[in-house]
């Protein structure tokens, strides 16, 4: 069950109640982003396994190891991980889950404040308004410049399996049941074929199935398989692209003749794309690919010769998908009505039995009820998961001359159905087995405090300044800044080495929130060479909290601390301070006082709204490789507006 939102202090009691209900319902695990919620689960609900949400932005082996030590049994890695990063994370021993199909966030996982700052709807609270699907301008180009294609790793499943991935995640939020059926079935069949040694990548029919159910400008293989920039983006259309069906040959008398590239069936949903997009549903005989179909146009539709036609939904595909819908559960019912005794109804699914009782049955003063009257009310199971497959599955034992109110019969039926559902759930919970073995409690380097610096650099008069021009360091210090935090513009080993060599002593270094395992290793090697002159490190990912460091560290905004549970969890790490979460109001920040660690509050400067792992400028220019020698970001104005 997903519980992967950041939680305010005054919401903790409600979250605890929700976790209790989740636990009692027999759930196996919860997916969590908030460190405070994770700590609460470990302490109060040890039977629930902890899965780290992709919103935690864990992107390398160090991040996976942090999660393992905290007590997470599975990590849903950030979508920006490469296959090499995935392999390295698997080696930590924690189960690894990766996104394999569906919508992608434009921003780095868990590092988007755009929706929150632009419209008050936080993506970290499950309320993203998807501003990245809106139109932006860059130079002379306007369009959905931040919108990404949907991910599809169907062909790459053997590589993921070979890397040791334990679970695949399909992004299906707000999608139809048919979408879930088609995509889940495709990946299930592929995994079974891989296990049997019969999988064949490049299956055009399977790709057609996936494209038809939903795609944005086709698919991307994502960061996992090295897609860059233009290979990630879908700038022309943010909704369903559909599949190309054909082109309009001629228009006459309210009809359009279309030459078909694909077969067309009655009930297919189409979109004619010319000067505007026009939606319609085809009604008529099926037409094979290569044939000509006649479309009846509405009076308001302006269609021209040469307009393209896309099929948005395939009626036959949807019909096949609906066959995957859960089948109703066959039940039997037995009712007993006796004057002066309570109404009674028994219902059974063959394993569980439930009983409902109603008011005492009275003698009829006028019209008496018949067994058929009772049957009509008791067999109404249409909006429930249950089914009376045969008439004889409902037996009624009743005396003559009784009065049976319709409302009482309906209430009796509803009560019986609810109790059977509860009995089935209880049986599931009982079968859930023993409490899962708890992982090791997170201890972190504080288990032995001998190498942990004492005292925090943050005090009542601390003025911290983050800067990216090494030449400014002395001037900032002269003007009263007493905590200087350097944020390199380029985080290559060579650039970082040169920057740190030119900085005065005592400067702190801000680590990027997203570093591949290799880049992280290179950076830490440079940091180690300058350890005696650096003041400390500002960490921008929860996964960095467990790095093997001896320098002092402060948790930045990339380690969201939004409640006192999270703050207490942070005190068990090396952090000597933290940064207040920028989405919270003053009253929400005060709610976690008194702070158990010194804190920083951002007072001035441009708030980073989105951290991107691709370049919109390169995407606009159609570039999808060769980043090594690119200098676009150092030339001119590169901001989208």
What are these regions (language model features)?
Residues 1-58, 76, 80-167, 174-641:
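Active-site pocket-lining/capping segments in soluble small-molecule metabolic enzymes
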Residues 61-62:
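Conserved nucleotide-cofactor-binding alpha/beta core module
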Residues 73:
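Long, basic N-terminal domains or extensions that often function
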